[in-house]
Design a protein with these regions (language model features):
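A recognition module on extended beta-rich or small alphabeta surfaces enriched in W/G with H and D/E
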Residues: 232-256
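Signature of long, low-cysteine stretches enriched in small and polar/charged residues
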Residues: 59-107, 111-116
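Secretory pathway targeting signatures of secreted, lumenal, and periplasmic proteins
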Residues: 3-62
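Amphipathic, interaction-prone secondary-structure segments
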Residues: 30, 189-237
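Short beta-strand
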Residues: 25, 72-74, 221-224
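N-terminal low-complexity, intrinsically disordered segments
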Residues: 140-198
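Surface-exposed amphipathic alpha-helical segments
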Residues: 22, 108-141
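Short, hydrophobic/aromatic-rich segments at coil-to-beta transitions
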Residues: 1-6, 31-32, 76-85
């Protein structure tokens, strides 16, 4: 079996495994989009909704009742209401395969849009891997491929540090090793209060971004640890992790 990548949703409602050669891409709010950027085999979208203890099962029953073209199917251990619709775009015909499924208090809407006649195995494998994470259960910490939500956090942190260096030191910020001394000046200036966690965390994230730019073999990942969901840097060769929070903020908090 081909190795896959694990995705744990923001808020850790659910997890799933998607193909190793796929990536996550920007989509509408509350919807997650995945596809292969090198060889397009279809767009997979998933949205999750939380409700009562039996909401997942009820969502499937409701879809079967209200959508006359929906049929009951089982994908691995997962019961779904399945339907499909065709459409044409610029002379090409596509099929949107739609699955409504759910487990416990979470309902899912999944779609896989492919060229007409193309297989849906990749989408079915993702759906079969779906797991709902229970709110009252403690899960071991996990490092997964970096999600878009953490990429946005990294970009925002970098932009804030860049603007702050320009504001206080009147110097351009290139995201290179030479900029670390400028960041140190900002840290030592007393302009950032000891309780400003987000600012100190942004400095830690930007330090890691410089390291990732300057040193080969470091890649961003997402850490899921209890309620904490954060970007971390991982050395691909040995799996060693650098946590931006511990670089700066943890030390400031401890009064170091």
């Amino acid at each position: 079996m081909k190795q896959g990548k694990k995705f744990i949703s923001p808020g850790a409602w659910f997890s799933m495994v998607y193909p190793a050669d796929w990536n996550e891409f920007e989509d509408g709010e509350g919807s997650f989009l995945f596809y292969n950027p090198n060889e397009w085999t279809g767009n997979f979208r998933i949205s999750a909704y939380k409700g009562s203890a039996t909401y997942g099962k009820e969502a499937v029953e409701q879809e079967l009742k209200e959508n006359t073209s929906a049929t009951s199917v089982k994908i691995g251990p997962v019961s779904c209401a399945y339907s499909k619709e065709m459409f044409e775009e610029e002379g090409v015909y596509y099929t949107s395969h739609l699955w409504v499924t759910g487990m416990g208090d979470v309902a899912f809407e999944c779609s896989f849009t492919v060229r007409k006649g193309e297989p849906v195995t990749e989408a079915e494998n993702i759906i079969a891997s779906l797991e709902v994470r229970r709110a009252n259960q403690k899960y071991p910490a996990e490092i997964i491929p970096v999600r878009l939500s953490e990429i946005y956090q990294i970009n925002e942190a970098y932009e804030w540090v860049s603007n702050t260096v320009k504001e206080y030191l009147k110097k351009d910020f290139q995201g290179q090793e030479e900029d670390i001394a400028n960041m140190q000046q900002v840290m030592d200036s007393g302009n950032i209060g000891a309780k400003k966690k987000e600012a100190w965390l942004a400095l830690g994230i930007t330090l890691c971004a410089i390291l990732a730019n300057e040193v080969e073999g470091f890649e961003w990942r997402t850490l899921i640890d209890g309620n904490r969901e954060a970007p971390v840097l991982v050395n691909v060769a040995d799996g060693a992790m650098i946590d931006p929070m511990k670089l700066v903020w943890s030390k400031v908090k401890a009064g170091e």
